[in-house]
Amino acid sequence: MRTIVITGGAKGIGRCLVEYFASQGDAVYFIDMDADAVATVTEKLCAKQMNVYGFTGDIADEQVLQKFAARVIEETPQGIHCLINNACLMKGGVLSGCSYDDFLYVQRVGVAAPYLLSKLFMHHFVGVGSIVNLSSTRAFQSQSDTEAYTAAKGGITALT
């Protein structure tokens, strides 16, 4: 059984990743800021006897990342096989008046959190381990009013 860690795992692509890896018999630890969605995914998959462990928190907050990583490391002495940095969000851009704070928030979720989680888990990977950073074509071509998201995807691409 492998141990997989996923950010943004309660909805969308992240939820599909959680469901897929859990269905393969892997232990999946995921984090998302939507408490209800975390509970729904965790309960649904645990009812099917899958090893899924949901954590509610905002990955833009360094303390949340520290606590999440500490929990995963404590509960997985055998190590981690894969970290999937999936979480990101849109807060608009220039046209919609995306504030400076909102722009920076998107960068913390989409770039800074993956960096810190990679650093926190660095010595806990099994064998060579894997870090998968999800990017987007937006990293190479922006679309109007998506500048915060585009910058985050450019940043995660540069980290990969």
Q: Whereabouts are the PLM-identified features?
A:
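Canonical Rossmann dinucleotide-binding motif of NAD(H)/NADP(H)-dependent dehydrogenases/reductases
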Residues: M1-Y29
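Conserved glycine-rich Rossmann-like NAD(P)H-binding loop of the short-chain dehydrogenase/reductase
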Residues: Q24-T40
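Substrate-binding pocket helix/loop in short-chain dehydrogenase/reductase
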Residues: V94-L95, S99-L104
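Residue(s) in the substrate-gating loop at a strand-loop-helix junction
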Residues: S136
